[in-house]
Amino acid sequence: MTNTLQFKEFSSFVNISFWHELSNKKLDELKLSEESIPLNGHYTFSPSQQLDPFLCLEFNAFLRNNVTNSTENQYVLPPRSYLSHGTLYNYNTVDDFKQSPKIKLFNDASKRIWNDINNGNIDKDTSLLNRFILLTYADIKNHQFYYMFGIPALLPSQPIQQFTEKPESINIESLKSFSNQILPQYFCLKQQQQESSTTTTTSFELIGSIEEKGNQYLNECLENDLIPLVGFCDPCSLPLNPGWPLRNFLIYLSIKYPMLKKIKVLCYRGNGSTSNSILLSLELPSMGEQLIKKQQEEDAGEWSGKSVGWEKDSNGKIAPRFVSLASTMDPLKLAEQSVDLNLKLMRWRVMPSLELEKIKTTSCLLLGSGTLGCNVARSLMSWGVRNITFVDSSKVSYSNPVRQSLFTFADCSPKAKEKSIAAADALKKIFPAINANAHVFSIPMPGHSVPQSEYQSIRNTIELLENLIKQHDVIYLLTDSRESRWLPTMLSRAHGKLCINAALGFDSYLVIRHGIKDQCQNELNPSISSKLGYQGSDLGCYFCNDVIAPTDTLKDRTLDQMCTVTRPGLSMMASSIAVELLISTIHHPYGGRAKGETETDVYVQGSTPLGIIPHQLRGFISHYQTLPLFSNPYKHCTACSDYIIDEYNSKGFDFIINVMNDSSCLTKICGIDDLKNTEVNIDWDIDISDDDDDNNNNNNKEKNDDF
């Protein structure tokens, strides 16, 4: 009596980590590519009758097998698991996914199995019998995925029959020899019977894997007219049916050994407290017809056999499946991935060379948390900057929230919050993963004298400011007075930090990138330096056009001078330009030491993928005009000249205290006073040597007054 053998198909089990890995790979590597990608899946034998046979994909499914280079990561199977070779086809749109050539792709996978059987690859690696294809569409913006699994099983010319009524159950004692062994995927074994006076016991012993011992063992059985006994690790738990991996294995045996008519198969399902392993007695169909068909395929170049294996949905239909991870993901991780999404999409087509990691790891110190500080912080976050520190000494007032984008009415009522703290808190509410810090202190300023009793407090403030500048990559000067920018300008120059200054007028703005003192200039080849335009240290600072020292401009101000009186849209323009200037600078090989460019022709290629890197930009909203300008550093600058830096390095705190109490010492130290005296003497000499009229003398007096 015979009955047709039926097999239990695989169900897919895709770990959430796989979808995360696919999203990252799509964003960072695949982009718009729809090329096929090799995958690794695995299954395990089933020790439980309650579990379906699962084909599993984990986070490491994209790693390679048989890696010889030690620097590459290799796919490692979980314990007691077996390999299945897959191919991923990921599509860019849901329509492409729906219209994909599913039948052709499935037949291609079937043909690979068939070819591996006939060209001898299976003799070396039986895991090639287990292949699958995965078709996907990844909606990474909404964290939704559509997918279809195909796990091909070749169909024989006739159904495979059992020559027993039902499979034979295996006693747990018979499998004791397997308890401490790691079994191969497919293997051959022998069955031994031991008789006693009362009972007959059966045991199974492993001979070896099909790759190592299969050919010798099966040929010996054919020569001696014996029924071979082979086995495989079965992921199925049904008492009457084997799992899917047996199908192609039987096809392989039928083709490899055409004289083999009967065979016994142990479906090994683990060695737990009880055994649900079964022993099948099978009749193999002749595969002669398929061998003839194979020759026809080689002539035609197409696969013409039949195969089955599409995974069905919950309704038993061959249809795409759908999974949404939005509800299962950590909201913080979800936000972080979504924040990076638009930035990474820029690299797909528009700008593949975008250095997002450099941007992400750049730390920014924002001195000033008002109108400019709030808008700069928002723009930095939009570019993916993760480390922002605010410094400010004032509190949020009722007039601030409408102009300063990080504040709300709650920040000034019922009790006003410190601006820097409120700004940092606002960033964390917008994006919890950001590293936003705040410090509350007033920056020491030239001409703002302090009593000796406050010297220690001022010293602590200066040390804190200097440490913050050392700890950050970029310093933004966004304060509301000119003199408050002097100390950060000087410290940034002294410590070689990129400093970007943004300042507002009523209908104009200035964004300037300060030059960085080149400490390694002597090590560069002068010819190379000249050729590449290595002029980063030849950029003036905010104070380089001054011939007077910064002094107290806050005293005796009227109300309209104390408040920020500018056209409201101006701060957003200046802030965005200040941030874009930083991003362009990051992409230059020399970073902050890049030369200043003034090219305005949009058809001329800039020095970075993002375009030119200007030294300064002056905008005039009255004429809707922005001008890229360049100015050399002033040798006698009151903030960035070597005279000032050397004085600070030698005297430190005492120098700053002197400047605070009497800012005129700056013009003396940097040499401006000497220049003035020289100019006066030159004019005086000219007046004596030239017998000019009184009109000339009056002109000279006006020139002197300009200083």
From Swiss-Prot:
The keyword Transport applies. Signal peptide: none annotated. Residues 686-695 have a biased composition (Acidic residues). One of its GO terms (biological process) is autophagosome assembly. InterPro entries: Atg7, Atg7_N, Atg7_N_1, Atg7_N_2, ThiF/MoeB/HesA, ThiF_NAD_FAD-bd, Ubiquitin-activating_enz. It is found in: Cytoplasm; Preautophagosomal structure. The keyword Protein transport applies. Pfam families: ATG7_N, ThiF. Homodimer. Interacts with atg8 through a thioester bond between Cys-563 and the C-terminal 'Gly-120' of atg8 and with ATG12 through a thioester bond between Cys-563 and the C-terminal 'Gly-124' of atg12. E1-like activating enzyme involved in the 2 ubiquitin-like systems required for autophagy. Activates atg12 for its conjugation with atg5 and atg8 for its conjugation with phosphatidylethanolamine. Both systems are needed for the atg8 association to autophagosomes membranes. Required for normal survival when exposed to pathogenic bacteria S.typhimurium by promoting autophagic degradation of intracellular S.typhimurium. This is Ubiquitin-like modifier-activating enzyme atg7. It comes from Dictyostelium discoideum. The gene is atg7.
